[in-house]
Amino acid sequence: MPTPSMEDYIEQIYLLIDEKGYARVSDIAEALSVHPSSVTKMVQKLDKDEYLIYEKYRGLVLTSKGKKIGERLVYRHELLEQFMRIIGVDESKIYNDVEGIEHHLSWESIDRIGDLVQYFEQDEVRVKTLRGVQKANEEKSN
C-alpha cells in the first residue's frame, strides 16, 4: 500500500497524464508545490515499487498498478468533494478539508460515503430536508 505522500504523487501524476498526456518532474513539482529534487526521489521510489516506469530525462508512465490506484485516488478525492458540497460545506473550504481527511479514511468508509452521496443525489428532496435540519440547528445555536 502506498503511503499518504505516495498517494499524493500518484494522484497528481494520474491527473497530469489525463490532462496533458504526460507528466514531467517540473509539472509534478509545480502542482504539488515541492522542489523538483523531492519529486525525483519520490518518482524513483514509485518506480521501485512498480507504480510507474521512470527514465531519467525521458519522463514517466504509470504502470497498470499505478493507473488503477491513480484512478481510485482521483475517485476518492472527487467523491469527498461531492460529499462536502452535499452536506453544505463552504466551497472555499472544501479542497483543504478533503486534503486533510482523504488519507485517513478506509476504503470501506469511502464506499459508505459513496452510498450516502448516491442516496442524496437520487432525490433532491433529501438534500432540501438536510438544509432544513441545518437551518434549524443554526437557529438553535444563535
From Swiss-Prot:
Q: Which GO terms describe its molecular function?
A: DNA binding; DNA-binding transcription factor activity; manganese ion binding; protein dimerization activity
Report domain HTH dtxR-type positions: 1-63
Q: Name one GO biological process term.
A: intracellular manganese ion homeostasis
What controls its activity? DNA binding is strongly activated by Mn(2+).
Signal peptide start-end = none
The family database entries (SMART domains) matched by this protein are listed as: HTH_DTXR
Which keywords does this chain's UniProt record carry? Activator, Cytoplasm, DNA-binding, Manganese, Metal-binding, Repressor, Transcription, Transcription regulation
| Matching InterPro entries | DtxR_MntR_Metal-Reg (IPR050536), Fe_dep_repressor (IPR001367), Fe_dep_repressor_sf (IPR036421), HTH_DTXR (IPR022687), HTH_tscrpt_reg_MntR (IPR022897), Iron_dep_repressor (IPR022689), WH-like_DNA-bd_sf (IPR036388), WH_DNA-bd_sf (IPR036390)
Location of this chain's protein in the cell = Cytoplasm
**Record keywords: Cytoplasm included?**
yes
Q: What GO CC annotations are associated with the protein?
A: cytoplasm
Among its keywords, does the record have Transcription regulation? yes
Major localization listed first in the record, in broad terms: cytoplasm
Residues recorded as binding Mn(2+) 1, renumbered to this chain, are 8, 99, 102-103
- Residues annotated as binding Mn(2+) 2: 11, 77, 99, 102
Tell me the function of this protein: Central regulator of manganese homeostasis.
Q: How does it assemble?
A: Homodimer.
What family name appears in the similarity comment? Answer: Belongs to the DtxR/MntR family.
Identify this protein by name. HTH-type transcriptional regulator MntR
